[in-house]
């Protein structure tokens, strides 16, 4: 059996080698020639999986070790009888930690009490729900918006988009969709951007294209935190220059998230092939507790991982893709013992 795997998939050799012969290729370089004789294709976000890639191939299973779905033509895969699995939720903890870290740093630098701020979360899936739990632990009031969930689940504490955009801190956590009753493409645009005020802290850590960048770059906010961009890696320089923190789509790039993404695909592939799982694979991420001896939450979080280094790395945007591919080691908070209480939820 032949497997073609994005070489950025975490521990691909240790996790997938016993299935057969592995060819590892950079995600952007995976093409129809490289997958023609493959049985299994495992990707991250940089490979467009569609008829152009797979027509004429013998691929029977596609696994994506990331949460996004806009790089996958699911209708095509279904029409060809190709099994598809996506590691939904694998990076929810990492992204929520990114947002909380930025809020804590901003509160210190701009001298405000985050417990007196409202946090508007748009999209209450894996990431949004995780972030809401962390915010509650920290005493931050949340405004939650997710029309599809509200429609089907009748959740009691959700509010409309206008109300959510009125929050002191607004963050997007929706998938990127262009069709359906509630498309998220350019969800924040010229028709509703006026709800964002010059005192608003605005995040996009979801997908590029959810906020209309040509409008965003002209609006004054208190702070912009931008991790996801239209047309990556050719990002909007004017918008980058407005940002308090501009990072190269790495909010979800913890070691834990990468491992969980690979492991979830591994589990799905075992099920697909009827193979027994190797229980030792779970030990690839285990490590002893690490100690942090800092007196404030800000200093503790920055000692665990300082996201300012990620922003500095792409001051030259030519580094965008290489930095993502060679991202520094970053562990999630539950691996650490600290003097300050970490909002682990």
From Swiss-Prot:
Protein location: Cytoplasm
Keyword Plastid: no
Family of the protein in this entry: Belongs to the D-isomer specific 2-hydroxyacid dehydrogenase family. PdxB subfamily.
Source taxonomy: Bacteria, Pseudomonadati, Pseudomonadota, Gammaproteobacteria, Candidatus Pseudothioglobaceae
Subunit structure: Homodimer.
Gene: pdxB
Function: Catalyzes the oxidation of erythronate-4-phosphate to 3-hydroxy-2-oxo-4-phosphonooxybutanoate.
Example GO biological process: pyridoxine biosynthetic process
Pfam families in the cross-refs: 2-Hacid_dh (PF00389), 2-Hacid_dh_C (PF02826)
Protein name: Erythronate-4-phosphate dehydrogenase
Reaction(s) catalysed by this chain's protein: 4-phospho-D-erythronate + NAD(+) = (R)-3-hydroxy-2-oxo-4-phosphooxybutanoate + NADH + H(+)
Organism: Vesicomyosocius okutanii subsp. Calyptogena okutanii (strain HA)
GO cellular component: cytoplasm
Major location category of this protein: cytoplasm
Keyword Transmembrane: no
Enzyme active site: 207, 232, 249
Coiled coil spans: none
């Amino acid at each position: 059996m032949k497997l073609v795997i994005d070489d950025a998939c975490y521990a691909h050799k240790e996790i997938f080698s016993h299935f057969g012969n592995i060819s590892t290729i950079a995600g952007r370089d995976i093409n129809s020639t490289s997958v023609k004789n493959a049985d299994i294709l495992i990707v991250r976000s940089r490979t467009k999986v569609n008829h152009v890639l797979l027509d004429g191939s013998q691929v029977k299973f596609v696994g994506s070790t990331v949460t996004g779905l806009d790089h996958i033509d699911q209708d095509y895969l279904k029409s060809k009888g190709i099994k598809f699995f996506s590691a939904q939720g694998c990076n929810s903890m990492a992204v929520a930690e990114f947002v909380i870290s930025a809020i804590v740093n901003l509160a210190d630098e701009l001298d405000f009490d985050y417990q007196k701020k409202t946090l508007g979360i748009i999209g209450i899936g894996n990431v949004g729900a995780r972030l809401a739990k962390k915010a509650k632990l920290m005493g931050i009031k949340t405004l939650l918006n997710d029309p599809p969930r509200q429609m089907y689940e009748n959740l009691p504490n959700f509010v409309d988009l206008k109300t959510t955009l009125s929050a002191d801190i607004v963050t997007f956590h929706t998938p990127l969709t262009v069709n359906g009753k509630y498309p998220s493409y350019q969800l924040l645009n010229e028709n509703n951007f006026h709800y964002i005020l010059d005192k608003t802290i605005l995040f996009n850590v979801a997908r590029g294209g959810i906020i209309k960048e040509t409008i965003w770059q002209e609006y004054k906010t208190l702070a912009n935190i931008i991790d996801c961009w239209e047309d990556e890696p050719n990002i909007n320089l004017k918008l980058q220059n407005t940002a308090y923190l501009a990072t190269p789509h790495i909010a979800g790039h913890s070691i834990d998230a990468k491992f969980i993404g690979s492991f979830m695909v591994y589990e799905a592939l075992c099920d697909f092939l009827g193979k027994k799982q190797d229980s030792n694979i779970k030990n690839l991420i285990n490590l002893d507790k690490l100690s942090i001896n800092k007196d404030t939450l800000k200093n503790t979080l920055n000692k665990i991982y300082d996201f300012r280094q990620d922003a500095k790395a792409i001051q030259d945007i030519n580094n965008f893709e290489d930095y993502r591919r060679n991202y520094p080691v970053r562990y999630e908070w539950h691996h650490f013992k600290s003097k300050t209480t970490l909002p682990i939820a």
